[in-house]
Amino acid sequence: MNYKVLLTLCIPFASWAAADYTEQDAMRVQAVKTYIDNVLQEGRSQIKTTPLLADGINTTTRKPVEWIYPDGRTATISNFANQQNFLRALTAMSVVTEDQRYQLEAVRITRYFMDNFIADNELFYWGGHRFVNLDTLELEGPQNKNSVHELKNHYPYYPFLYHVDPHATERYIKAFWQAHVEDWQSLDMGRHGSYSKNYDDKVFHRPIPASLVDQSKLPIMPETKGLTFINAGSDLIYAAYQLDWLAPSANAQGSAAWGQYLMTQYKLAKHPKTGAPVYQFTSPKKREWPPQSDKDTNSKYGDRAARQFGPELGDIAREGNVLFKSNDKSIVFNNALIELHLAEQRNDAAIREQVVDALLNFYRLAYNPENGTIKPIFSDGTSIEGIPLARDGYYGPKGRVFNAHKPKTEEYLLPILRAYRLQADPELWQLAANMTHHYGWGSLGNDAKAKPTLNMQLSSVSPMTLFSAIELYQITQQPEYLEFARAAADKLVEKRFVRGYFLANPRYLNASIDAIEPLALLTLDATLKGKTAQVAPYLSGSGYIHGEFAGKENAYDTNEIYKQTR
């Protein structure tokens, strides 16, 4: 791995001295090795001999998983966009074992994909609605989604892709923006990109327009045809900044400037009084008169939140202001991790402060420190907790009730700790201390200098437990956090390493090869060996395929395939 790639694969914070390494530490790495070996052996086609891998494996039959079309036809799924954390795990395995075979395997897989599955307009054939049939090498996709290009919270491993093929990676990022932005003056963009839209090598040469968001009109947002979901926008932002980082000699391309412009629109659209972040910075423009039935929620009929909540809540009822129904997670988990990574990578104080403000303003409104739950709110703080929906709509059927929820894992905690590592705001520490208390961790103490009292016998752990504990160790250098991470890692292997794969529930039948557990375990091992900075950081990443599946019109593989039970 050359010096430039090493820099781009790194977590920018320092690696500290190695800890004493034990036999138990080695056993955890052996579990990951077994998992990787199983994926590489059982995840390949028995019909077509290629380096490509299936997205998942049936842990009973040991065969690749399949997409089932409404007519009963099946296709073995190989979606490279849904395998990016597996690539990160392969490169991390080479770091901790000093065995380059794993990274070379990652190169082989990546090169084959990039040599064979790029469209004429330079888009990759991957994402939420497009994949390769592993057994035929034909392109596939759910029929009701028109096989469009879509990335939402995917966050590809761009530094590694660039290492393998700089030319294809650069052209892909340009094509990604070209395909998803319909109007560059209004930044009318959408989550769906066309494979037939022409490639433009000078896509980032366009002049930056004036900001679209007029803060004097908030909470009413400007109207566009496209849907500016932050889970799609953050992938565009990340890609633009990564192109600038990886190819700085081509800085005149303006990719970072466009990434900053898009990021700024979300910032400008935050609520003017509470400062709470938003999910969109525009509202869908009404292009047709809505039907009588509220169950038809196509965005061409206008803002779905205004239709469903407007009569009761007024102007705040806009899609961008909705901070529930998983919108909050996309903002304060996925997007926060990406922007924190960019802030650290570029040493950009403005991005860092923007993320810290968004996190604090959201949790001041939504978080209940008494029980560790998060309320369903709009960006002005209006809560709909316990209130039945008055009518059918995009956010659920009439009568549905949204309640406060406690995240099942520490995913909301992780960005708070990463933010604190970059900007030691005492309010962030107190928030983290309260959250960990409700997860049964014990006590972090009043500040980062305090000696923690930690529960080494957690009954429930996840990869987020490990990542969060590692952040605390990086922040404090307190050995208790490292021992806590080791104990959590042992429990993680005990509970989730099942039939040679990592499963969130041992009763699940199919294992995704993009499981996060291996990267979490290898990040811990790298930390123990003083090699944290050589391992690719965890940036979330939520790969999926969405569309018609086995007779269901609106299905996700994450539910229909990976939550099947034995």
Q: Locations of the language-model features?
A:
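Sec-dependent signal peptide recognition
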Residues: M1-T8
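A ubiquitous, low-specificity "background" feature that marks scattered single residues
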Residues: T8-C10, A520
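Hydrophobic h-region of N-terminal signal peptides that target proteins for export
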Residues: C10-A17
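Glycan-recognition and catalytic cores of secretory/periplasmic carbohydrate-active enzymes
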Residues: A18-R566
